[in-house]
Each structure stands twice: as C-alpha cells, then as structure tokens.
Amino acid sequence: MDVLINKLASCNFSRTRNQVGKPCIINCVPGAGKSTLIRELLNSDSRFRAYTFGEADPKNLSGRRILPASELQNAPQGALIIIDEYTEGSWEPGKICAAFGDPIQSRGPGIVADFVCNKTKRFGSSTCELLNGFGFEIHSEKEDICLVRDFFEVEPEGTVIAFESEVKDILARHFVEFEDICSIRGKTFEEVTFFTASNSIPEHLRADFFQCLTRHKNKLTIACPDATFAPS
C-alpha cells in the first residue's frame, strides 16, 4: 500500500483522510493522469495487476498493461488488484487494493474518496472556467480554446460529438459523422465540436454533458441554439 500512496502523492493526488480504506478509493477528473499512474505502478512493481471497466490497453511486448475487467477472474493469487473506472461495473471490495474512477462522469453512485485530484492535464483553463460556472470543480495550468457557436451556422472542426436523439437525427440527415456518448468514454481528441439542443446543462444529464465537454485537448466548440450556453 505504501508504494501506491507514495505514487499518488508524487502525482499530485490529495489525501482526504488519515486512515486509508481498503480498497483505497481514488476519485479524479478527466485528464488527471490516472491511466498513466496505473501503468507506472504496473511497470515498477510486479505485484500489481490492473483491470478496467473502460477501454483496456492494447497488447504490448512487456505484457504489463491495463486489462479488461472481464479478465479479473483470472487475476493471480496474491496480486494487488487495481480497478479502473470502478463506477462502471460490479466488483468485490474485499479483493481489491485500489479503485480509480470519476463519479462525476457516471450516473451511478460514487464512493467516499481516500485521494482526489481535480487538476486536468488534458484541456485548458478556458474549458475549466466554463465547467466551473456550472458547479464542477476542475482546474488546469494549460491554455485551450472554448467557443460557443450557433447550432446551424457552425462549421464542425475535429471530432463531432452528440448524444441527444433529436440532435443525432439532424446530424444524420446532413451526413455529419459523429461520436455518440457510448463510444467516447476514456477517449481524447485534439479538437471537438459538441452539438446540443440545450442552452444549459439539465441536472439529470450532468454526467452526459460532462463527458462530452471533456474529450478535447486543444479546442472545444459548443454548437447550440442561438449560440447561448450558460447556467440557467
């Protein structure tokens, strides 16, 4: 456990309580570097095994990678097991060393955290300012571009994302290729154009909007009615 705690501290994860639970629960924002941290643990200490309910790592020469959760039943006896994207599946706490996740992106319940990180290395301060205006807590030291444009006047750039059925129908009629919400979790794109029929974030859709607004690295364009997107 000391290896894990020291690694979390060195990667700017903040401890929330003195007594760390078992499993150790780590909640973090998109782009906090959790996947990189997990891979570093795997490569530095052979006792660790990692399994994800998100997108698993591709096979590599070393054989040390984040595996799909479907292979959890094959974990070696005595391994220190890490669960990634813990909010997205079922697992037995008694068998787990640590669990990483982002309850803000999930509609399911989160767990009280032992460590947290609200600093993202993925996108920049302009997007963070927008998100914080809606009550999220996230910050960044890099710069990015965050624009709000009219739904029918915008020229899509980069990867197009949409999840509302009426929006997807419009995009399909105009032969615009797009990513749906079911395909974007854990993914990052250089630029994103997010199409929405809303001018704000409905409370019951906070998790979905948060996912769509946090997939980019350099530029986010929000295409919405009347080019207005702000807290209601």
Swiss-Prot record:
<comment type="similarity">
    <text>Belongs to the Tymovirales TGBp1 protein family.</text>
</comment>
<dbReference type="GO" id="GO:0046740">
    <property type="term" value="P:transport of virus in host, cell to cell"/>
</dbReference>
<feature type="domain" description="(+)RNA virus helicase C-terminal">
    <location>
        <begin position="118"/>
        <end position="232"/>
    </location>
</feature>
<keyword id="KW-0916">Viral movement protein</keyword>
<keyword id="KW-1035">Host cytoplasm</keyword>
<dbReference type="InterPro" id="IPR027351">
    <property type="entry name" value="(+)RNA_virus_helicase_core_dom"/>
</dbReference>
<dbReference type="GO" id="GO:0052170">
    <property type="term" value="P:symbiont-mediated suppression of host innate immune response"/>
</dbReference>
<comment type="function">
    <text>Transports viral genome to neighboring plant cells directly through plasmosdesmata, without any budding. The movement protein allows efficient cell to cell propagation, by bypassing the host cell wall barrier. Increases plasmodesma size exclusion limit. Acts as a suppressor of RNA-mediated gene silencing, also known as post-transcriptional gene silencing (PTGS), a mechanism of plant viral defense that limits the accumulation of viral RNAs.</text>
</comment>
<dbReference type="GO" id="GO:0003723">
    <property type="term" value="F:RNA binding"/>
</dbReference>
<keyword id="KW-0945">Host-virus interaction</keyword>
<keyword id="KW-0941">Suppressor of RNA silencing</keyword>
<keyword id="KW-0694">RNA-binding</keyword>
<protein>
    <recommendedName>
        <fullName>Movement and silencing protein TGBp1</fullName>
    </recommendedName>
</protein>
<feature type="domain" description="(+)RNA virus helicase ATP-binding">
    <location>
        <begin position="1"/>
        <end position="117"/>
    </location>
</feature>
<keyword id="KW-1090">Inhibition of host innate immune response by virus</keyword>
<dbReference type="Pfam" id="PF01443">
    <property type="entry name" value="Viral_helicase1"/>
</dbReference>
<keyword id="KW-0899">Viral immunoevasion</keyword>
<dbReference type="GO" id="GO:0030430">
    <property type="term" value="C:host cell cytoplasm"/>
</dbReference>
<comment type="subunit">
    <text>Homodimer and homooligomer. Interacts with capsid protein. Interacts with host AGO1; this interaction targets the host protein for degradation, thereby suppressing the antiviral RNA silencing.</text>
</comment>
<keyword id="KW-0813">Transport</keyword>
<dbReference type="GO" id="GO:0005524">
    <property type="term" value="F:ATP binding"/>
</dbReference>
